[in-house]
Each structure stands twice: as structure tokens, then as C-alpha cells.
Amino acid sequence: MQIKSAKFYLSSQKEKDCPKTIMPEYAFIGRSNVGKSSLINMITNQNKLAKTSSTPGKTQLINHFLINNSWHIVDLPGYGYAKTSKSNKKHFQKSITDYFKHRKQLASAFILIDLRHSPLKIDLDFILWLATNKIPFSIIFTKIDKLTKTEIDNKLLNYKKELEKNWEILPEIFLSSSKKHRGKEDILNYIDKINQSII
């Protein structure tokens, strides 16, 4: 799939304030500083569509981007940022859970995980929560340019072993590097395949 147009559409604090459209949506979420905004910019051929920052927890709203005038990318607040206040954590958690539980336009979620790290409970718990609530999702492992091929293979194997504790069939998995533009085609082809079945 080719991205012919990509533009900011709307920022919302709550799920009920999100766009009232019937277009399919693909939500991108992960721990703070996982490279989410950089990935969105990479797959949309934009440099500044999603605001990037070295400060974790920068994304604090539900941000919709209109792609090819037919579907949305949704940039969700990152989870697990320790320096966020308790009240903000509670607000972010509610806005995220409300979005996933009630947003009928959601076609699939993409969970972003920094492959440099060992499997973390916060990521595994969130993945399990999505599965328990029957929310379709895939996993994108980010920042693979920081690893050797052997390190990628070993770390990917560790994650698969953890996931296999709860699943016989693993979710779709993508490897990406925004810096090296890796994974873009696979992710867009996957989205296109889903779009073809519902648009």
C-alpha cells in the first residue's frame, strides 16, 4: 500500500470525543519512549506528522491522523511513565481502556515494544489485557537497528517463549527500525489487507 496523503485530524482527551466517522482505525501504543511517534512518521513518509520527543510521556492525548482519506492512525498516550503524576496516570489509563473497550472503529491495535529490553511485565500484562477483552492486536518490535542479527534472534525467541505461555497461536509480529526504515512495507501491507476486508 502507498501512502498518498497523511494529515493531522483531531486530538481528543476521551474516547467519547474521538471522531464520529466510520473509517477503520489502527491504534499505536506502547511504553513511553518506545519510538511510537518516529514509527508513525516513518510509515506515513512524514517527518513531523506525529510529534517526537526525547521526553517520555509527551503524548497525552488521543491523536487521530487521516491516511489516504480513508482510514486513521491513532497515536495513543504511552503507558508506564514513572514520573507522571498519579492523577495523570489514572486519566491516561481510563482514556486508554475506554478507547479500546468502546471504540467500534478500531480495526487493530499495534503494541510497540523496544526489542533491546528483556520481556517486561507491564508489556506482557497489557497484551494479556487486550486478549482477554478480545481486542485484535499485533506486536511491533522497535529499534532493531541497535541490535545485531544474533541479538535480534535471541531476544525475539525470549519474547515468543513468554507469549507461548498464554497462546498456542502467536499474534502477528513485526520488526521495525524507524532510523533504517525497516518494517514499513510489512506493516502497511498488513493494514491494507485488513482494510480490503472491511472498507
Regions found by a protein language model. Give the residues of each.
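Helical mechanochemical/support elements of P-loop NTPase systems and associated helical scaffolds
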Residues: 48, 61, 72, 88, ...
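Conserved C-terminal guanine-recognition region of P-loop GTPase G domains, centered on the G4
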Residues: 97-170
